[in-house]
Amino acid sequence: MAPSNLPPIFNATSQDIEMLLAAQCHLGSKNLQVHMDPYLWKTRPDGINVINIGKTWEKIVLAARIIAAIDNPADVCVISARPYGQRAVLKFAAHTGAAAIAGRFTPGNFTNYITRSFKEPRLIIVTDPRTDHQAIKEASYVNIPVIALCDTDSPTEFVDVAIPTNNKGRHAIGLIWWMLAREVLRLRGTIASRETEWDVVVDLYFYRDPEAEENKEIEEAKVPGAEEVGAAAIESGLVGDSWEAQVAPAFAATGAAVPAGAAPGWEAEAAGEWAASSGAAAGAAETWATDTAAPDAGVKW
């Protein structure tokens, strides 16, 4: 929690602290950069540096106040070259109106005015100072303030406001961006207070692997036993043991539509017609024999 000598606005709720701990925002790396030492709480026996969560919350509130002080939200540029933060910066930009650069940062975006992607933001926010070093370097050339999510081993050169947190985990990155967006909207008046539940869940800011999501959808849509039954049976709907239940009523309905005396009548008709046909054929054979024998009778050998 925040120290007692700070204003009450810096006090975080117990739910916020629990979310930060659950997302492992307090777990840093084994290396420690000298400028990140004030944000360190302790070092575990296994060498992992633990970050002070109270300091993390203070910097989130401070960064949100800086963002809210900018009149035009589009003058804020959020950047993430790290894949785990690309979805988060896009969601942050959608909810706050900022400009997002997700993926590779094109060199010259802030310095080369000839390029189509040239921007002149008043503030940039980066996910990782190490992977987004090109954006920070160009921002230093044109005097753009920088807010960065910094781990214990992150370089802090040209970083004006460092938010100490775990910037390598997908849940930690998504939660920090979500809290930052919620705090900005609270300062703008969109959200009444921190106690008011935001209708945007934090899961929307988490990274999702496209291939894993596609495979998951395929597995959910896949019919069990498709390899054994075959595609034709799946299209007809006769899969597994259900065909007996579907075929039996069909035969029953067909049999019910036929009158009870239809079977003997059919046999009788068929027998009569066959007998008549046989008799006609026999008569034809006798007539043919008579016709052929008649000329032979008058022939003298």
From Swiss-Prot:
Pfam families: 40S_SA_C, Ribosomal_S2. It comes from the Eukaryota. Keywords: Cytoplasm, Ribonucleoprotein, Ribosomal protein. One of its GO terms (biological process) is ribosomal small subunit assembly. GO terms for molecular function: structural constituent of ribosome. It is found in: Cytoplasm. GO terms for cellular component: cytosolic small ribosomal subunit. InterPro entries: Ribosomal_uS2 (IPR001865), Ribosomal_uS2_C (IPR032281), Ribosomal_uS2_CS (IPR018130), Ribosomal_uS2_euk (IPR027498), Ribosomal_uS2_euk/arc (IPR005707), Ribosomal_uS2_flav_dom_sf (IPR023591). Required for the assembly and/or stability of the 40S ribosomal subunit. Required for the processing of the 20S rRNA-precursor to mature 18S rRNA in a late step of the maturation of 40S ribosomal subunits. HAMAP family: Ribosomal_S2_euk. Belongs to the universal ribosomal protein uS2 family. Component of the small ribosomal subunit. Mature ribosomes consist of a small (40S) and a large (60S) subunit. The 40S subunit contains about 33 different proteins and 1 molecule of RNA (18S). The 60S subunit contains about 49 different proteins and 3 molecules of RNA (25S, 5.8S and 5S). Interacts with RPS21. This is Small ribosomal subunit protein uS2. It comes from Blastomyces gilchristii (strain SLH14081) (Blastomyces dermatitidis). The gene is RPS0.
